[in-house]
Curated annotation (Swiss-Prot):
This is Small ribosomal subunit protein bS21. GO terms for cellular component: ribonucleoprotein complex; ribosome. GO terms for biological process: translation. Pfam families: Ribosomal_S21. The gene is rpsU. Keywords: Ribonucleoprotein, Ribosomal protein. It comes from Anabaena variabilis. The keyword Ribonucleoprotein applies. Residues 43-62 are annotated as: Disordered.
Amino acid sequence: MTQIVVGENEHIESALRRFKREVSKAGIFQDMRKHRHFETPIEKSKRKKLALHKQSKRRFRT
């Protein structure tokens, strides 16, 4: 769980910015998206295969 301690003279906007930065560092949003819907093993393998294909295309192009 990500926690931010807001200072006494700190603006809420800067605290919110720090919180967003910590959440993105921790990878919480990616994990949330990954677990949003149940994914069957076949769907998971298809997604991984497609990601490998895209990655190899990028490597080949450069």
